[in-house]
Amino acid sequence: MDIAVPSVLHAGDFHVGGIHCGDSLRKVRSLYGSPTKYARSAHYTTMQYDGKDIAMRVRSRNDTADILKETGEEREGVRIGVESVFLTSGKDAVFGRGLRLKMPAEVLVRQMGIPSNVLRDADANIYYFVYENPARDGAMIFAVANRKIERVALMPPRPPYSRGEALPVQNKWSERDFTLMGFSLNQPFQANKYNMWNNLVKRDSNNFWLYGDYGVEVDRRNMVQKVFLLTNNAYTSRGAALGYHISTVLSLYGRPDRVEVGPEAEKSVDAYYYDSPFQKGVSLVFVVNHASRYVEDVLLISAPIQNLQDPMARYGLQS
């Protein structure tokens, strides 16, 4: 099993349109010319570019007294120069590792590796893929909607984007890795915690709450027993989704604990299991088309899948 190891991100990877944190406004002007709007306060200068080719806002920290630039025991020194860049349109603007707006989310994670955080705006159904630089003093935040990069920001890391935890690596886990759509297994279920449910299906003593992009199985004690993705507009905590090639999943998660290989048949599927070290019997499972190697299902389970080859049985929704 060949597993690509994401290369380490470097400070030079953290840029938007060639602008890095700490760059001068002179450099910004040399790249993009005079701004459409210009505003200066005591501490910051903001330049806005609004044209047919680009929409971008650059915020820079003005120069200040040398003593304020020094880092002391109880405070960080002020960093002058560009502090943040926000790009909302511009098909030719390159950022990160050769990325552009409208590129697929799968290309994003293949180029940038494992996100340090993935957040979801449940109301707008927008995901934010967060990458922090090795020094932990800068972050790139990619807004993903309809499976594509819609916006990107370069800014200092701060909550809720930065969690202050160790950056994730292959085969090293946090409890967050064994959640799906915000749900943990064997925890009390709250129906409208993130989204309004669309449909409720009963099977024996369990309820299946179906949302637009995912479903949740709940037992008679109102405890979550299974979570599964229904569309390719939903992502795991490491940015994986339906429709990804298995090589992308392996680059994000590393070597699985086990693989269940299906028969040699036209619609046969295999299952890649990642077992939680935090909850016995809990696994994150990627179901992959045996021939094409693309992900067909993602499930967080607490009991074995009874019939892997039957899509409805995988969910537990067989008649």
Task: List where the protein language model places each region.
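A cross-family detector of function-defining hotspots
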Residues: V5, D23-G81, S89-Y161, T179-R221, ...
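Structural motif
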Residues: F86-T88, V227
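Second-shell loop/turn segments in exported
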Residues: G12-I19, K91-L99, R176-G182, N233-A240
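N-terminal low-complexity, Pro/Thr/Ser-rich intrinsically disordered segments
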Residues: M1-G18, Y161-Q187
